[in-house]
Amino acid sequence: MHPSTFVTTIACLAGLAHGYANPGSCSGACNIHDPALIRRQSDGKYFRFSTGNKISYASSSSIKGPWTVLGSVLPRGSSINLPGKTDLWAPDISLVNGAYHLYYSVSAFGSQDSAIGLATSATMDPNSWTDHGSTGIRSSSSKPYNAIDANLFHDGGNYYMTFGSFWHDIYQAPMNSAATAVSSGPYNIAYNPSGTHAVEGAFMYKFGKYYYLFFSSGICCGYDTSRPAAGKEYKIRVCRSTSATGHFVDKHGVSCTNGGGTVVLESHGHVYGPGGQGVFTDPALGPVLYYHYVDTRIGYADGQKRFGWNKIDFSSGWPVV
């Protein structure tokens, strides 16, 4: 066998071994953490939001880029009076009744004193955002959950907020008809009873008859100074249900409230610790899983994390990338 053919064959076999496609291309501003993605209704422009710089955001004509940074959603920080009000996390973006709703987290790393806030804009243009403060979803040490990592889901006229990180993991709460405030108490929809309960960053998406609950599990951050044991780093998992409010199970029928979760994407090749995900219906590509990841060819620091995306195949009833 010619040496070049041998190398190509080995590369192909390696690709089959991990089974995951490499991230789609990204140009322009591609360093990002906790991305949130939407396409503006009026002109089809893409907007991408992320943790840092009081919710940094960028725009592009395509999911591939080139991404151009526009600035901060809330340059003065949040009106929510909690530590971390000028260090906002984990944005989530939705179009609600003709306005763009940007949900954000106010907290300090490792703290349970947290809240989910809301900012709105009619256009998403720079300097067009209005902060509305808390949605009423808050947590403290007396609660079984941590009120961060919001995701709004709309189903048949009803809005639900899914949120949570560690502690008792993922909760869901009904929202009012304007999706501005919680309307009743939260309930648990995902929990890993083992270890440190390392589950967070949930995102709901409906395809066909199923509601899919995507979430990140494992250790998210600080890889440059303290690398977790192999397999303990971030990865993306999923459970599904025929109802927006549960009961979610994984591919083997294990309940998501009892440690269930089928792996959708994990470390492979030069991709390490993918997570902080969402799902977006692209007009050209169809369903797309987007996320952040470490490119091991570049570096492991949090500030070096990259924007990744892959097309999703739901033909088996489970998301495959």
Curated annotation (Swiss-Prot):
An MF annotation (GO) of this entry: arabinan endo-1,5-alpha-L-arabinosidase activity
Catalytic reaction(s) noted: Endohydrolysis of (1->5)-alpha-arabinofuranosidic linkages in (1->5)-arabinans
Pfam family, one: Glyco_hydro_43
Single GO BP term: xylan catabolic process
Signal peptide segment: 1-19
Record keywords: Carbohydrate metabolism, Glycosidase, Hydrolase, Polysaccharide degradation, Secreted, Signal, Xylan degradation
Enzyme nomenclature, EC number: 3.2.1.99
Coiled coil: none
UniProt similarity note: Belongs to the glycosyl hydrolase 43 family.
The name this protein goes by in its record: Probable arabinan endo-1,5-alpha-L-arabinosidase A
Species, as recorded: Aspergillus clavatus (strain ATCC 1007 / CBS 513.65 / DSM 816 / NCTC 3887 / NRRL 1 / QM 1276 / 107)
GN (gene name): abnA
